[in-house]
From Swiss-Prot:
Biased amino acid composition, Basic residues: 1-24, 42-51, 64-98, 116-125, 138-166, 184-193
Gene behind this protein: BR2
Name of the molecule in the record: Balbiani ring protein 2
Domain of life: Eukaryota
Entry GO terms, CC: extracellular region
Amino acid sequence: SKHSKPSKHSKHSKPSKHSKPSKHSKPEKCGSAMKRTEAAKCARKNGRFNSKRCTCTSVGKPSKPSKHSKPSKHSKPSKHSKPSKHSKPSKHSKPSKHSKPEKCGSAMKRTEAAKCARKNGRFNSKRCTCTSVGKPSKPSKHSKPSKHSKPSKHSKPSKHSKPSKHSKPEKCGSAMKRTEAAKCARKNGRFNSKRSTCNSVGKPSKPSKH
């Protein structure tokens, strides 16, 4: 009939407390699919995943895995987790403009040596530094003089770093000879390969330190 009322037990029949696990309950049994899901969530939070207990332990404190837990953006990475986007780069990743790189690769050495040769400084391959001195440095194989060469950011040129037009280099290698000969040719002078000097037409040049 229309007015038939359901039994008392039908209205008040509520599911038992243990039928549906709450959001924060720990799953007693954790399958392979559940483990992969929880492990992925735990990795995002940079925590440690315990496959036996199927729990995610954050750095320092164990956390209860929840279905709706979202990893925070500013979570600190643990030693064994993948580095997050906000992890600070290491000291050696990108050297700043004024910092001296501790480790200097072969490509870096060639670049710095070329810059140092242009300024007639001394290049220290161990420390990867260019010391500006009045005396010319030993030229590197890859140093090519350019008209628009800019001094490197790591070294501060001193007053005596740039030799005058008529200065005599004490040691003149094959690369330095080519460089000096090219400069001398631009001035329409005569280049002496033995003394590595450029004599202007008619008068020999006098060396000056400044």
